[in-house]
């Protein structure tokens, strides 16, 4: 939905980015009569590869089983006993399988629109927070001004760039063990985790709850994880560590998805090993989508936006707020992103109410 107001009128709130954080921020801002304008991202090959298409990274996830309110399993038994007369009315279309990522994101998007959110399917390429109202420059050209801004551009998982990795994304290849590890396809199956830092060890340890065994693949001869985390992996009987190995290829077929991996030695040229696996989890870090800010906000050493107040979404510039994975390098869950989206809208509303902007 394009903005029909004068280009000279400053928007009250502009939200940059979509996903759970952006749509939650939009819903709360719209309900507060702030008339939010959302730049949900452009539909482009660049954004597809980065996982920053409209609707956010969750739109690339086939199944979501851990978002509150969308249970997997048989809801019929509960509804028959609790609300037998209303069973048909209450039964959701996603009954029995949780909800897909695109389905959840489209529902959140539509909810925001229902309350009056306006949407532009484009990227913001650069910003100027040095003057008020703030200046935002869309990729399609022109200039938008805003009294308050919420940045919800997320963080993109790092990938190896293998063609086979791309082929089997959401068919056994994932970048989030907590999101996908409990899916039925991975239960009691051998799984592979690629990486050697704390995140990789945490994901490998988490997956031992579901997998028959976990193969932790690291290209060096020692783990980069902290000593206590590394020792935990070494001592775990369900984790096998493959040192000095790099993922060369994800193996599989159209019918079954991932069936294994081919590893290549980093110390012995030409030496390869095949490992059977039903899933491959990349744990080689994330890159927050903050490059377009170009020094306008304070960032951490890892380029995440800094929240300047405890349990608030304020950034280093008053009137600019951050929500979701663009500022969170710890939890990185859809539901926590949605929570900070809500917080950012409330923070923006209160800031604006005190005659700022």
Task: Describe each model-derived feature in a short phrase.
Residues 2-4, 8-10, 31, 161, ...:
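FAD-site-proximal beta/loop scaffold in flavoenzymes
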Residues 3-5, 13-16, 20-115, 201-227:
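Beta1-alpha1 glycine-rich phosphate/pyrophosphate-binding loop at the start
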Residues 10-11, 145-147, 188, 277, ...:
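Active-site acidic short loop of glycosyltransferases
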Residues 16-17, 192-195:
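Conserved N-terminal Rossmann-fold NAD(P)-binding element of oxidoreductases
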Residues 19-20, 155-157, 197-199, 328:
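Residue-level detector of alpha-helix initiation sites
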Residues 26-27, 161-164, 204-206, 228-229, ...:
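Short amphipathic alpha-helical segments
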Residues 80, 85-87, 103-130, 136-138, ...:
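A Rossmann-like FAD-binding core segment of flavoenzymes
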Residues 119-122, 127-139, 146-149, 153-179:
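Glycine/small-residue-rich loop that forms an oxyanion/phosphate-binding "nest" at active or ligand-binding sites
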């Amino acid at each position: 939905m394009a903005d029909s107001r004068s280009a000279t009128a400053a928007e009250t709130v502009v939200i940059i980015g979509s996903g759970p954080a952006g749509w939650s921020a939009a819903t709360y801002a719209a309900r507060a009569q702030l008339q939010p304008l959302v730049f949900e991202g452009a539909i482009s090959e660049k954004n597809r590869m980065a996982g920053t298409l409209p609707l956010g990274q969750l739109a690339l996830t086939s199944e979501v089983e851990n978002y509150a309110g969308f249970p997997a399993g048989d809801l019929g038994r509960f509804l028959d006993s609790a609300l037998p007369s209303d069973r048909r009315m209450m039964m959701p279309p996603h009954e029995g399988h949780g909800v897909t990522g695109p389905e959840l994101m489209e529902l959140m998007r539509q909810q925001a629109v229902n309350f009056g959110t306006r949407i532009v399917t484009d990227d913001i390429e650069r910003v100027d927070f040095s003057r008020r109202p703030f200046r935002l420059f869309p990729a399609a050209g022109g200039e938008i001004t805003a009294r308050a801004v919420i940045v919800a551009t997320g963080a993109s998982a790092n990938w190896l760039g293998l063609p086979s990795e791309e082929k089997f994304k959401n068919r056994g290849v994932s970048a989030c063990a907590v999101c996908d590890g409990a899916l039925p396809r991975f239960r009691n199956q051998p799984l592979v985790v690629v990486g050697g830092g704390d995140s990789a060890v945490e994901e490998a340890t988490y997956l031992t709850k579901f997998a028959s065994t976990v193969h932790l693949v690291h290209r060096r001869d020692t783990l980069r994880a902290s000593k206590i985390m590394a020792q935990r992996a070494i001592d775990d009987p369900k984790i096998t560590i493959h040192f000095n190995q790099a993922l060369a290829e994800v193996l599989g077929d159209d019918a079954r998805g991932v069936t294994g991996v081919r590893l290549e030695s980093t110390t012995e040229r030409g030496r390869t090993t095949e490992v059977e696996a039903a899933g491959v989890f990349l744990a080689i870090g994330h890159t927050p989508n903050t490059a377009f800010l170009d020094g306008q906000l304070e960032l951490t050493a890892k380029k995440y936006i800094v929240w300047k107040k405890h349990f608030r979404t304020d950034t280093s510039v008053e009137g600019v707020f951050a929500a979701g994975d663009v500022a969170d390098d710890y939890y990185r869950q859809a539901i926590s992103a949605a929570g900070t989206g809500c917080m950012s809208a409330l923070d923006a509303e209160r800031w604006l109410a005190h005659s700022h902007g």
